[in-house]
Structures are given as structure tokens and as C-alpha cells.
Amino acid sequence: MKNNIITPRYNLEGVFLRQIHSFVCRKGRTTTSQLSAIKKYWSLIGVDFQLNALNFSSIFKHRAPIILEIGFGSGESLVKTAMNFPDKNFLGIEVYKSGIGSCLHYASSYQIQNLRIIYYDATEVMYNMIPDDTLSKVQIFFPDPWHKKRHHKRRLLKNIFLKIITKKLIIDGILHIATDSESYAFYILDEIKDIKNYKNLSEKNNFVKRPVSRIITKFEKKGLLQGKKIFDLMFQLKK
């Protein structure tokens, strides 16, 4: 397992180029059990970052529709979803080592066979590793909203990234986003409105009800208890 989660960029003179990311590499505590899970199970479930496209048949035992989840947090809901849909293959991307360790722990406990995870920046994974026209669904649940206006440049779900996703989805594939930030929800609607390939599956062209397939996370439960409203956005890729 590689410890770097971004690819450093340099100019022709060898000077490091500062990049804007949708995450901050916080020095959060990775527990002993999480580190142990990484050591034991990464070789079984983890996929190292590479600069060329993945061959999905080489990382999954069975051929099946592929669902990509970006930013799976602890991985508990991702693992449960993979258990609920054994006829699908799941690929998760996460930038925090604690989340990687936690997900590996859950997956190994339930002996999940249809899940693989990547420890790297999602933008670079999408650019380099995900072949075009291969994903049946992309799900991004509770991405960092970066509330302050000066931090909006860090938001993952900008127009350029949403366009990248259109290249990776199959026709009629689904993009499903959930957020507890109303301002971010409307920001996403604004960023995606000019991308003609996306069809909003909401009757009112805004939000949909939470589908039963999306498991309510601990983070979401906490927000609901605090009176927060959850916004589900769902789009289908059309020709």
C-alpha cells in the first residue's frame, strides 16, 4: 500500500506546483486496529494507484455492473451496500487512512468478495484509472461542502469534475449525490445544469427522495437528530 495520495506536479524547471484539492491531509489518528486491518487485508481488497486504466476483470472475481463510491468515510455503509447487492461490483475511493483501515476491517469481518478500494485522490483516480464507459453508477455521499466562499474552489463537485464523470458512466448510468448542505445542493444543481448529457431524475428538476438502496449513515443520523435536512440528487446519463 502506497502512503502518498496525490501525484506531485512540477514545472519544467523542477519547481513544485501547488495544487488545489477537495480535501486536507489532516493528521488524524489511525487506530491500532485500523493499521492492523491495512496490514492484513490491503493485498486482498486494496488496489494501488496507477497511471494507466484498470482492467476490472483482473480485480473482481465475477463480471458485474460496477458501482463507484467516492469518499466512503468509515466504509460501513459501503460494505453493507455491497452485501445487499452481491450481483454488483463496488469500487470505493478514500483519501483518509483511518477510513481505509476501518473499511478493510468491516469488509474482512463479513468476507466481502465484491468490493475493492483505492487509497488516493479521487480526481486523479478518475483521470487515470477508470476506463471510459464502464461505470453503471457513481455515488458521492456527503462530500465536504467547504462552506466558506473562499474555499469553494476546493469543492469536489464542480462543473469540470461532473463532466469527467459523464465520460466514465455507461449510457443510462446514474450519478447519485447526497448532502446535508442546502447551499452545496443548489451549487451542484447550478454546476450541472449546462451539462446536457445529464437528466435530473427529480420531477421538479431538483431533489429526489432517498432511495432505499442508500443506507443511512451514522453521520446522517447525527445530522437528522440535529434537525438537518438531507438532499438527494440523482442524474441519469443520456446520449
Curated annotation (Swiss-Prot):
Substrate binds at residues 148, 180, 217-220. It is an enzyme of class 2 (transferase). PROSITE patterns: SAM_MT_TRMB. Pathway: tRNA modification; N(7)-methylguanine-tRNA biosynthesis. GO terms for molecular function: tRNA (guanine(46)-N7)-methyltransferase activity. The active site is at 144. S-adenosyl-L-methionine binds at residues 69, 94, 121, 144. It holds the Pfam family Methyltransf_4. Keywords: Methyltransferase, S-adenosyl-L-methionine, Transferase, tRNA processing. Its EC number is 2.1.1.33. It catalyses: guanosine(46) in tRNA + S-adenosyl-L-methionine = N(7)-methylguanosine(46) in tRNA + S-adenosyl-L-homocysteine. GO terms for cellular component: tRNA methyltransferase complex. Monomer. Catalyzes the formation of N(7)-methylguanine at position 46 (m7G46) in tRNA. Belongs to the class I-like SAM-binding methyltransferase superfamily. TrmB family. This is tRNA (guanine-N(7)-)-methyltransferase. It comes from Buchnera aphidicola subsp. Acyrthosiphon pisum (strain Tuc7). The lineage of its organism: Bacteria, Pseudomonadati, Pseudomonadota, Gammaproteobacteria, Enterobacterales. The gene is trmB.
